From Swiss-Prot:
<dbReference type="InterPro" id="IPR036638">
    <property type="entry name" value="HLH_DNA-bd_sf"/>
</dbReference>
<dbReference type="InterPro" id="IPR011598">
    <property type="entry name" value="bHLH_dom"/>
</dbReference>
<dbReference type="GO" id="GO:0005737">
    <property type="term" value="C:cytoplasm"/>
</dbReference>
<keyword id="KW-0217">Developmental protein</keyword>
<feature type="domain" description="bHLH">
    <location>
        <begin position="36"/>
        <end position="88"/>
    </location>
</feature>
<dbReference type="GO" id="GO:0030182">
    <property type="term" value="P:neuron differentiation"/>
</dbReference>
<protein>
    <recommendedName>
        <fullName>DNA-binding protein inhibitor ID-4</fullName>
    </recommendedName>
</protein>
<keyword id="KW-0539">Nucleus</keyword>
<comment type="subunit">
    <text>Heterodimer with other HLH proteins.</text>
</comment>
<dbReference type="InterPro" id="IPR026052">
    <property type="entry name" value="DNA-bd_prot-inh"/>
</dbReference>
<keyword id="KW-0678">Repressor</keyword>
<dbReference type="GO" id="GO:0032922">
    <property type="term" value="P:circadian regulation of gene expression"/>
</dbReference>
<dbReference type="Pfam" id="PF00010">
    <property type="entry name" value="HLH"/>
</dbReference>
<comment type="function">
    <text>Transcriptional regulator (lacking a basic DNA binding domain) which negatively regulates the basic helix-loop-helix (bHLH) transcription factors by forming heterodimers and inhibiting their DNA binding and transcriptional activity. Inhibits the activity of both neurogenic (neurog1/neurogenin, neurod1/neuroD) and myogenic (myod1/myoD) bHLH factors.</text>
</comment>
<dbReference type="GO" id="GO:0000122">
    <property type="term" value="P:negative regulation of transcription by RNA polymerase II"/>
</dbReference>
<dbReference type="GO" id="GO:0046983">
    <property type="term" value="F:protein dimerization activity"/>
</dbReference>
<keyword id="KW-0804">Transcription</keyword>
Length: 131
C-alpha cells in the first residue's frame, strides 16, 4: 500500500486559476483606468461649463441694458453685450471733450501679445478667464 500525502503537489492545472486571476485583476485595473480617465474628462467638461456659466452671469450683471429679474438666454446676453459695446464706442466717438483732445497713442496688439510684462495680472478679477 502506498502512502498518500495530505498536501497535493501543485500541478499545471492548479496554476491556471491564479494566472486567470492575475489577468482578471489586470483587466479590472485597465477598466478602472478607463473609468477614471472618463471621470476626469467629465469633471473637466463640467468645470468648463461652470466657468462659462459664471462668465455669462458676470456679463449679465455688468451690462445695464439686461433686465436683472428677467431670464434671458445666452444668445440674448451676447446680443446685449455687443449692443452695449457699440453704444459705448459711439459715446466715446461723439463726446465733445474727447473730440478736442489728441487721440492717445495705442500700443499695437502684436506688442501686447509678445511682451511678457503685459501678461502680469493686476487685479484678482483679471485672473478669471472666460474660455
Amino acid at each position: 500500500m502506498k502512502a498518500v500525502s495530505p498536501v497535493r503537489p501543485q500541478s499545471r492545472k492548479a496554476q491556471v486559476p491564479s494566472v486567470c486571476g492575475e489577468l482578471a485583476l489586470h483587466c479590472l485595473s485597465e477598466h478602472s483606468l478607463g473609468v477614471a480617465r472618463y471621470k476626469m474628462e467629465e469633471e473637466e467638461t463640467l468645470c468648463l461649463q461652470y466657468d462659462m456659466n459664471d462668465c455669462y452671469s458676470r456679463l449679465k450683471r455688468l451690462v445695464p441694458t439686461i433686465p436683472p429679474n428677467k431670464k434671458v438666454s445666452k444668445v440674448e446676453i451676447l446680443q446685449h453685450v455687443i449692443d452695449y459695446i457699440l453704444d459705448l464706442q459711439l459715446a466715446l466717438d461723439t463726446h465733445p471733450v474727447l473730440l478736442r483732445q489728441q487721440p492717445p497713442t495705442r500700443t499695437p496688439l502684436t506688442d501686447l501679445n509678445t511682451d511678457p510684462a503685459a501678461l502680469v495680472v493686476n487685479k484678482q478679477g483679471d485672473s478669471i478667464l472666460c474660455r
